[in-house]
C-alpha cells in the first residue's frame, strides 16, 4: 500500500507543521527556564535557524494562541502552548533517560 493511500498529502503537511510547532514550543520552554525572557533571535540561535524562518513560525504560533509576544518582542507561552511544550519536554526527557539506561549514546 502506498503512503499516499493511507495519508493524503495535506495531512502529511499538517503533521509536519505540528511537529515543527511542538519543537518551537519546547525550545521556548527550555530557553525560558535559562533566561528571564525569550526573543526570536534566541530561538534562532538555539535551533540554528534563520531569523526570518523563526519570525514566520512565531507569527503562526501567536495567531494560533500558543504564544504571547509583548511590545519588546519578549515571547511567553500561553497556557495551551505551555501544556504542549511541557508534554514534549517530558517525552523527550523520558526517551533520553531510557536510551541512556539501555546504553545508547
Could you describe each region identified by the protein language model?
Residues 73-91:
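Basic, amphipathic "hinge/linker" alpha-helix immediately C-terminal to the N-terminal HTH DNA-binding motif
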Residues 17, 77, 104-105:
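Alpha-helical hairpin
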Amino acid at each position: 500500500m502506498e503512503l499516499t493511500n493511507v495519508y493524503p498529502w495535506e495531512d502529511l503537511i499538517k503533521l509536519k507543521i505540528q511537529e515543527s510547532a511542538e519543537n518551537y514550543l519546547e525550545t521556548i520552554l527550555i530557553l525560558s527556564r535559562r533566561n528571564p525572557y525569550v526573543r526570536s533571535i534566541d530561538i534562532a540561535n538555539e535551533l540554528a535557524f534563520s531569523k526570518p524562518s523563526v519570525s514566520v513560525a512565531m507569527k503562526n504560533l501567536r495567531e494560533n494562541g500558543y504564544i504571547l509576544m509583548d511590545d519588546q518582542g519578549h515571547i511567553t507561552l500561553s497556557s495551551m502552548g505551555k501544556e504542549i511544550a511541557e508534554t514534549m519536554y517530558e517525552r523527550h526527557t523520558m526517551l533520553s533517560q531510557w536510551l541512556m539506561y539501555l546504553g545508547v549514546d
